[in-house]
Amino acid sequence: MEPSATPGPQMGVPTEGRERSPEPPDYEDEFLRYLWRDYLYPKQYEWVLIAAYVAVFFVALVGNTLVCLAVWRNHHMRTVTNYFIVNLSLADVLVTAICLPASLLVDITESWLFGHALCKVIPYLQAVSVSVAVLTLSFIALDRWYAICHPLLFKSTARRARGSILGIWAVSLAVMVPQAAVMECSSVLPELANRTRLFSVCDERWADDLYPKIYHSCFFIVTYLAPLGLMAMAYFQIFRKLWGRQIPGTTSALVRNWKRPSVQLEEQGQGLGAEPQPRARAFLAEVKQMRARRKTAKMLMVVLLVFALCYLPISVLNVLKRVFGMFRQASDREAVYACFTFSHWLVYANSAANPIIYNFLSGKFREQFKAAFSCCLPGLGPCVSLKVPSPRSSASHKSLSLQSRCSVSKASEHVLLTSVTTVLP
């Protein structure tokens, strides 16, 4: 039997006094340690980015969850617009919970660490959430445009809104399938592929260079440029209708319309404690409806503007990269990296911005948020129910208050005119 060729003690050969040959250094492990220490470990400004991502993560999850709970627990908030707002919040929760952590790790390590399967799933879900957000905002604008500019052409209902939401998700899931089909995971350093996932990339793989140019040009037009243009025109007409002088929305027009009911009230000689005429009550209800519509339109315009600003950088950078082939041989790599990283963060910041907008521009959502936080944080005040009084009880309280103030016809006219001045912004 031949002696073993492996190093170590052999039978019958003394080992005392013999020195073992040193093992050869593992250059691959040393190289990986160098990459982690000097290249992959977050730098100072990247820690700021991590903190910003963490803040967006918690604000987006908590805020959008509260939006969904507020509408779910309060029947009076289940309007068509709020159904679409809940759908937008669900898309924001999806992209925040699944896509944000992956984007953060990719931006910091510049490596895809999640394998081949998630390389297809996560970008696909991100594209779906973008499509859902754009279509939802478009349906909100369309609903408001019909309700305010052409109320007799189309009547929006909760049932139609729910059907539209199902259609939005079905279309988004189907249209974004090509995004999942072209995503592939590969390693920049194939010799290290079996030892580490560092320097693996998840990127698009197309059969021809022409295909990505066509796809991303269409993606930019369909999911950003065209919808925003149409929504801008719709809200411009809504703005003119709600704030224009030609409609009965200004104080002078309201005063003129009120004169006739007040004169009739005096002629009929109604005494003390008389309620305002039905026409006067309807008139005041119209004024309040105008005020509510203005507030809602203002909030939705701000939501659309913030969405456009947050998605503009990444949309432009993707077109420059995929369509025009820029950034392949970038001389200033750090600047390009900073631009893409900041644009990625802006996309997720939009998900956190929406609940903040609702809080500042919607009194109903603000009340629900305050009630929820008062239950979680005792220092903010006593815990109150997330459900608010029904509109019927609130209306009866207001009716009693108005009745007590309408002692004579002149007094009722003064009260209503004062209400008109304060109701309209």
Swiss-Prot record:
The cellular location(s) given in this protein's UniProt record come to: Cell membrane
Topology, Extracellular side: 1-46, 106-119, 183-213, 322-336
Kindly list the residues the record flags as site (Important for responses to orexin).
Answer: W36
- Per its UniProt record, what InterPro entries does this chain match? GPCR_Rhodpsn, GPCR_Rhodpsn_7TM, Orexin_rcpt, OX1R
Query: Got any disulfides in this one, which pairs?
Result: C119-C202
GO CC terms: plasma membrane
User: What domain of life does the UniProt record list for this protein's source?
Assistant: Eukaryota
Glycosylation sites recorded in the entry for this protein: N194
**GO MF entry, a single one:** orexin receptor activity
- Which keywords fit this entry according to its UniProt record? Cell membrane, Disulfide bond, G-protein coupled receptor, Glycoprotein, Membrane, Receptor, Transducer, Transmembrane, Transmembrane helix
Q: Which residues form a coiled coil?
A: none
Instruction: Region Disordered: list its residue ranges.
Output: 1-25
What main location does UniProt list? membrane
Cite the residue spans of the region called Required for response to orexin-A. 26-41
Give the Cytoplasmic compartment stretches of this protein.
68-82, 141-160, 236-298, 361-425
Q: Name one Pfam family in it.
A: 7tm_1
GO terms under biological process: cellular response to hormone stimulus; feeding behavior; neuropeptide signaling pathway; positive regulation of ERK1 and ERK2 cascade; regulation of cytosolic calcium ion concentration
Q: How does it sit in the membrane?
A: Multi-pass membrane protein
For this UniProt entry, which segments traverse the membrane?
47-67, 83-105, 120-140, 161-182, 214-235, 299-321, 337-360
Question: Would the keyword Iron be found if you checked this record's keyword annotation?
Answer: no
Q: What is known of its domains?
A: The N-terminal region is required for orexin signaling.
State its role: Moderately selective excitatory receptor for orexin-A and, with a lower affinity, for orexin-B neuropeptide. Triggers an increase in cytoplasmic Ca(2+) levels in response to orexin-A binding.
Q: Per the similarity annotation, which family is this?
A: Belongs to the G-protein coupled receptor 1 family.
Name used for this protein in its record = Orexin/Hypocretin receptor type 1
Q: Which organism is it from?
A: Bos taurus (Bovine)
Gene for this chain: HCRTR1
